[in-house]
Amino acid sequence: MNVTAHIEALTHWVAAIAQSLAANGVKDVVVCPGSRSTPLALAVARHPSLRVWMHLDERSAGFFALGMARARGMPAAVLCTSGTAVANLLPAVVEANLARVPLVILTADRPPELRDNGAPQTIDQIGIFGRNVRWFVDLPTPDMALLPFLRATLGRAVGLARSAPAGPVHLNLPFREPLVPDRARMAALFSETPSAVQVTPARRMIGGAELAMLATSLVEYRRGLIIAGPDCPPDLGPLLTTLAHRLRYPILADPLSGVRYGPHVDEYTLGTYDAFLRDERFVSSYAPEVVLRFGAMPTSKPLLLYLQHHPHARQIVIDGGAGWREPTSLAREHLHVDEHWFCIALADALASSQREGPTLWLRAWVSAEQTARTIIQSHLLPQEHISEPGLFARLGSWLPAGATLFVGNSMPVRDCDTFLGPRTNPLYVVGNRGANGIDGLVSTALGLAAGQARPLVMALGDLSLLHDSNGLLAARLHRLDATILLINNDGGGIFSFLPQASETDQFELLFGTPHGVDFAPLAAMHNAHYTLATDWSAVHEALQASFTGGLHLIEVRTRRDQNVIDHRTIWPLVSNALAQAGITVAE
């Protein structure tokens, strides 16, 4: 080997990668320590337009990058060494794929002559993420003659990560030793104008004739719904509100849709349907003729059952990502069109035929929302004991305008859906609902905190925190401000609501999984301010104090058996109130 020529090619190679990332809008690179990734780690660390975020654990690092990409609305990159380090990125890649979050996965590897022959820290990394990435390429070892190909590959990769449906891409990067590039030569390359290849994603649209035909048909339907599921495109709320007013249809807004909270919210925006759609009389009486669906499948199971109860309704899925987020198999029309463009164009097409005043259908849904919300608030807010529903019923007034609430999976996201109703103050509610896992939640939330300048609160269950306790290290390493609202019911609370709860002889062992962990030492380990809040005033005071900065862990303890009672007491109260208000019988 000609070492001088090798280092020259290596330096140009990794410099071109760093320049291409920056030229294509990547600003953040999450780096895990390792030897084989040395050349690229040094390049991204020295590039003036890239910021490096060190992370010691690859699984947490992947989710941290995912959170940053969510916050920025642009791809983040994550770099790791070869071997099992790569495999640890799989959970985050799966989530990014299903949640349509743009990630650029950069994995160092051994060169071909060291693969599949027992070389240390070497595994088969070719296609390791399978169908969970938008694109995979196993790049050649550094070669001066292939620099144009490298730049084209980087531009293509970032472009694919950003294009609808956004998602992860994987670049596998073999490097031979020696691994240290020429520092002075790299600095000179970075001072030159980069010759990067760039890709501009396009928006999907439909023809004017098709849109006019749709508008004409929608005018004929008085009993319509707009459903905004998780992960709607940013800033869709005001456009959906305008469309709802044109059609006189209520919006059933999932808390993770970005539509339930903000100054655009008015009486058309409903957030308590998870409660009143448990009422069989309402479900049977109010059959929709048409349903316009945006985003992923909603969190609410009662809403899913409602749609299944009315299979003959015309369901139209609007998906700018041209994917398939329709597990019910009820929708017979799928429009692969940019959601923003669609809402504006359809609202314009409906302007001349807008209905006068609210319809009886709209009034019934708005009344059901107001009735259920009143019952829930009047039942939960006077309660003295700390409950999981009561916590989310209070968070709407406790969180400051513009805050980010990251909700964990299992019970927290469901309680957020049911009990944290619409509000006009901006609130950004985020969760990992791609694969619905409880892994990587702390790291995702801290990635959000790193990528934005808003107060961040993560509401997590105890098992979720234990799953990703390593992720807390990022808060200390990068001096991040974040509040963990820990809902500790000593195990898997959601199983108490499922049929498994009847298996009493094995329930605690297999499903309840009590652990008895004391979280105070965990907080101390990571220099977090710890509070065990035993009443509502203590929770409120600790939450407000946490917004002064730093990492805070506020623990509230609940009982799983009482939690079931707290939930199941509410549903008959809502049903009775609907009946007394005369809402359960269609007019």
Curated annotation (Swiss-Prot):
Concerning CDD domains, the annotation shows: TPP_PYR_MenD, TPP_SHCHC_synthase
The UniProt subunit note reads as follows: Homodimer.
Q: Which GO terms describe its molecular function?
A: 2-succinyl-5-enolpyruvyl-6-hydroxy-3-cyclohexene-1-carboxylic-acid synthase activity; magnesium ion binding; manganese ion binding; thiamine pyrophosphate binding
- The UniProt gene name for this protein comes to menD
Report the pathway entry.
Answer: Quinol/quinone metabolism; 1,4-dihydroxy-2-naphthoate biosynthesis; 1,4-dihydroxy-2-naphthoate from chorismate: step 2/7; Quinol/quinone metabolism; menaquinone biosynthesis
Q: Which PANTHER family match?
A: 2-SUCCINYL-5-ENOLPYRUVYL-6-HYDROXY-3-CYCLOHEXENE-1-CARBOXYLATE SYNTHASE, PROTEIN PHYLLO, CHLOROPLASTIC
Sorted alphabetically, the keyword list is: Magnesium, Manganese, Menaquinone biosynthesis, Metal-binding, Thiamine pyrophosphate, Transferase
Identify the cofactor(s): Mg(2+); Mn(2+); thiamine diphosphate
Q: Which family does it belong to?
A: Belongs to the TPP enzyme family. MenD subfamily.
Descriptive protein name: 2-succinyl-5-enolpyruvyl-6-hydroxy-3-cyclohexene-1-carboxylate synthase
What's the source species for this entry? Chloroflexus aurantiacus (strain ATCC 29366 / DSM 635 / J-10-fl)
